[in-house]
């Protein structure tokens, strides 16, 4: 049989007391402080949405590729139309872009169907008993590529706006992270381990008196290697004493 108090709580109409999680929205997503940076906070428009603010500042609110529709902004003629990369031009638009010219064709004498289009470069010349095209006498396959193909231009990086430039300067001026230095007590503890066990890291890990926190063999090796590096480098005071000794 269950506890009577637990059964009463289950029957009670009072809501269950639950701890509030800080930094978490009702949807369960993590709450992000968008105004954590001073530069962004100064240029933030509270009337606009997060996406609108990020687009205006020249930033990306989502690193993933767009997976749906985008917001249509208002223009003078109405709503903005987003150009689709998969849109196929109609026949009228295609004829406007294409250049109209005349060319020679070879037809089948029986059916009258066009067999091939004769271009100026396709004129055949007989060389060493073989008929080859005058434009490609060596039958080079690379020469068959069309010269009219558009060249792939390298992507030109857009000039960043002032806010992005300020953020980049702020990121470049961040002070480098200082390396962690071992304390005096840690150095004394390492010296006692080395005096007792030498280079036997497995014995150091099993020593319950000198290693009460049960540091692993790999962790002890890293600490001792770091200690050896700093002990071999002379301190500033030692360097000063050496310089004075040389001068005297």
UniProtKB/Swiss-Prot annotation:
A Pfam family annotated for this UniProt entry: Nop16
Keyword flag Nucleus: yes
Sorted UniProt keywords: Nucleus, Ribonucleoprotein, Ribosome biogenesis, rRNA processing
GO cellular component, one term: nucleolus
Principal place of residence: nucleus
Compartments where found: Nucleus, Nucleolus
UniProt GO BP: ribosomal large subunit biogenesis; rRNA processing
Region (Disordered): 1-27
Amino-acid biosynthesis as UniProt keyword: no
Subunit structure: Component of the pre-66S ribosomal particle.
Biological role: Involved in the biogenesis of the 60S ribosomal subunit.
Family recorded in the similarity comment: Belongs to the NOP16 family.
Full protein name: Nucleolar protein 16
Organism: Emericella nidulans (strain FGSC A4 / ATCC 38163 / CBS 112.46 / NRRL 194 / M139)
Gene name tied to this protein: nop16
């Amino acid at each position: 049989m269950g506890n009577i108090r637990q059964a009463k709580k289950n029957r009670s109409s009072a809501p269950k007391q639950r701890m509030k999680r800080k930094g978490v929205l009702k949807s369960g997503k993590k709450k992000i402080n968008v105004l954590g940076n001073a530069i962004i906070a100064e240029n933030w428009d509270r009337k606009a949405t997060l996406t609108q603010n990020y687009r205006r500042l020249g930033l990306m609110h989502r690193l993933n590729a767009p997976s749906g529709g985008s917001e249509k902004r208002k223009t003078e003629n109405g709503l903005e139309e987003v150009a689709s990369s998969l849109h196929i031009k109609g026949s009228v638009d295609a004829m406007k872009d294409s250049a109209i010219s005349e060319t020679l064709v070879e037809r089948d004498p029986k059916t009258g169907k066009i067999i091939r289009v004769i271009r100026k470069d396709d004129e055949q010349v007989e060389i060493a008993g073989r008929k080859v095209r005058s434009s490609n006498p060596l039958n080079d396959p690379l020469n068959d590529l069309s010269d009219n193909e558009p060249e792939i231009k390298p992507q030109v990086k857009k000039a960043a706006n002032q806010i992005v430039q300020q953020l980049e300067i702020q990121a470049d001026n961040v002070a480098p992270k200082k390396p962690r230095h071992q304390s005096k007590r840690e150095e004394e503890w390492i010296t006692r381990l080395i005096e007792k066990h030498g280079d036997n890291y497995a014995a150091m890990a099993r020593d319950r008196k000198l290693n009460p926190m049960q540091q692993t063999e790999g962790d002890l090796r890293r600490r001792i290697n770091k200690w050896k590096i700093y002990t071999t480098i002379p301190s500033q005071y030692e360097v000063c004493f050496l310089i004075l000794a040389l001068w005297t």
